[in-house]
Amino acid sequence: MQQGSAPKISFVSLGCPKALVDSERIITRLRAEGYELARKHDGADVVIVNTCGFLDSAKQESLSAIGSAMAENGKVIVTGCMGAEPEQIEQAYPGVLSITGPQQYESVLEAVHRASPPIHNPHLDLVPPQGIKLTPRHYAYLKISEGCNNRCTFCIIPKLRGDLVSRPAADVLREAERLVAAGVKELLVISQDTSAYGLDLKYAESSWKDRSVRARFLDLARELGELGAWVRLHYVYPYPHVDEVVGLMAEGRVLPYLDIPFQHASPNVLKAMRRPAAQDKTLDRIKSWRAACPDLALRSTFIVGFPGETDADFAYLLDWLDEAEIDRLGCFKYEPVAGATSNALPDQVPDEVKQERWNALMARQQKISARRLKRKVGTRQQIIIDEVGPTVAKGRSKADAPEIDGSVYVSSRRPLRVGEIVTARIERADEYDLHGTVAGF
């Protein structure tokens, strides 16, 4: 660093959207102190790596990122979920400057200060009111809580991030309002268990504008829906009170989209996972949700090859999917995670069987997705534009979250802008995407 110049930070953010929000908070604090962001590791005074430690494959990706930072720079600070159990990092890279777990923002800042002290300029404000975002300007993740009270056997998130800690409703709403004022058109509500929001606070009220708002899933969703942006709900568990939120979707207050991680359908597997096993009742609820809100899109994730999963269990899952008709689906092959209680379960499934089941499930889902998307041909859909080209733009409908769902490719005779919301006539559908033309031309 040259004498008098601002110190530069290079940042690597790995893992889920919750970790991305953690990265945004750290960067916002550092920018407020005058730090600049470097495009490359070798041009930075220090590198921060926000790790993921959920799966062994994610740990390997984190270790690889740390190794690259050490090779290209040498001054590396490690934080995030993998940092909660630092032994593996310390063994592989004993020269890292600091290792901390998730949400330990102050410890990260202290490590940065030790490695490269800030230059204070009281006349310069480097941070906009909405903070520093790592997403495109037109959408942002809004984290409403940390941690989780569930104890699924395959998951170590409670060990890494602790039990549920919800933010006061007014705090969430103030952040959301700042984001919308800064140009954000879509708020993606995230947590480990969004529908449990406020349980730890006993649904306490907090002051928002001229009224009090309870820290309750329904109340928060209703208030967010008044801010003038798309509101998309992720990581929702199918608790009974979710039915009330579907009512808000039917009224057009929040997007008709639910991201619910069902993980499986077989009662035997769900019991081994320690997840709600009444998936037959869930099918009835899905039908009632769609009756109340016909445009509802459902996204979910599933695990195949969980210990003890039999051919009959897997066949049950495929039949369940045919009836549920999940719109968007992600599937993972089970892999052991250090510290997870599922590691000790009997009847581990061979890797080749996991792969066969993954292939079969994704093939089945491809047909379901194509069938559901075909029904949208001839309709008009609102599309938020993510990328623009000379004649065709890439965007998403209300049924598509960024990065994980499908896309809508639209033609237009006029230039479109990133973040613009247009109405398009859908003319064609394939397995995962839609194609159309901006209406009015």
UniProtKB/Swiss-Prot annotation:
<dbReference type="Pfam" id="PF00919">
    <property type="entry name" value="UPF0004"/>
</dbReference>
<dbReference type="InterPro" id="IPR005840">
    <property type="entry name" value="Ribosomal_uS12_MeSTrfase_RimO"/>
</dbReference>
<dbReference type="GO" id="GO:0006400">
    <property type="term" value="P:tRNA modification"/>
</dbReference>
<keyword id="KW-0963">Cytoplasm</keyword>
<comment type="function">
    <text>Catalyzes the methylthiolation of an aspartic acid residue of ribosomal protein uS12.</text>
</comment>
<keyword id="KW-0408">Iron</keyword>
<feature type="binding site">
    <location>
        <position position="16"/>
    </location>
    <ligand>
        <name>[4Fe-4S] cluster 1</name>
    </ligand>
</feature>
<keyword id="KW-0949">S-adenosyl-L-methionine</keyword>
<dbReference type="Pfam" id="PF04055">
    <property type="entry name" value="Radical_SAM"/>
</dbReference>
<dbReference type="GO" id="GO:0035599">
    <property type="term" value="F:aspartic acid methylthiotransferase activity"/>
</dbReference>
<feature type="binding site">
    <location>
        <position position="81"/>
    </location>
    <ligand>
        <name>[4Fe-4S] cluster 1</name>
    </ligand>
</feature>
<protein>
    <recommendedName>
        <fullName>Ribosomal protein uS12 methylthiotransferase RimO</fullName>
        <ecNumber>2.8.4.4</ecNumber>
    </recommendedName>
</protein>
<feature type="domain" description="Radical SAM core">
    <location>
        <begin position="134"/>
        <end position="371"/>
    </location>
</feature>
<feature type="binding site">
    <location>
        <position position="52"/>
    </location>
    <ligand>
        <name>[4Fe-4S] cluster 1</name>
    </ligand>
</feature>
<dbReference type="GO" id="GO:0051539">
    <property type="term" value="F:4 iron, 4 sulfur cluster binding"/>
</dbReference>
<keyword id="KW-0808">Transferase</keyword>
<dbReference type="InterPro" id="IPR012340">
    <property type="entry name" value="NA-bd_OB-fold"/>
</dbReference>
<dbReference type="InterPro" id="IPR002792">
    <property type="entry name" value="TRAM_dom"/>
</dbReference>
<dbReference type="Pfam" id="PF18693">
    <property type="entry name" value="TRAM_2"/>
</dbReference>
<dbReference type="InterPro" id="IPR038135">
    <property type="entry name" value="Methylthiotransferase_N_sf"/>
</dbReference>
<dbReference type="GO" id="GO:0046872">
    <property type="term" value="F:metal ion binding"/>
</dbReference>
<feature type="binding site">
    <location>
        <position position="155"/>
    </location>
    <ligand>
        <name>[4Fe-4S] cluster 2</name>
    </ligand>
</feature>
<feature type="binding site">
    <location>
        <position position="148"/>
    </location>
    <ligand>
        <name>[4Fe-4S] cluster 2</name>
    </ligand>
</feature>
<dbReference type="GO" id="GO:0103039">
    <property type="term" value="F:protein methylthiotransferase activity"/>
</dbReference>
<dbReference type="InterPro" id="IPR006638">
    <property type="entry name" value="Elp3/MiaA/NifB-like_rSAM"/>
</dbReference>
<keyword id="KW-0004">4Fe-4S</keyword>
<keyword id="KW-0411">Iron-sulfur</keyword>
<feature type="binding site">
    <location>
        <position position="152"/>
    </location>
    <ligand>
        <name>[4Fe-4S] cluster 2</name>
    </ligand>
</feature>
<dbReference type="InterPro" id="IPR013848">
    <property type="entry name" value="Methylthiotransferase_N"/>
</dbReference>
<dbReference type="InterPro" id="IPR007197">
    <property type="entry name" value="rSAM"/>
</dbReference>
<dbReference type="InterPro" id="IPR005839">
    <property type="entry name" value="Methylthiotransferase"/>
</dbReference>
<feature type="domain" description="MTTase N-terminal">
    <location>
        <begin position="7"/>
        <end position="117"/>
    </location>
</feature>
<dbReference type="GO" id="GO:0005829">
    <property type="term" value="C:cytosol"/>
</dbReference>
<dbReference type="InterPro" id="IPR020612">
    <property type="entry name" value="Methylthiotransferase_CS"/>
</dbReference>
<keyword id="KW-0479">Metal-binding</keyword>
<comment type="similarity">
    <text>Belongs to the methylthiotransferase family. RimO subfamily.</text>
</comment>
<feature type="domain" description="TRAM">
    <location>
        <begin position="374"/>
        <end position="440"/>
    </location>
</feature>
<dbReference type="InterPro" id="IPR023404">
    <property type="entry name" value="rSAM_horseshoe"/>
</dbReference>
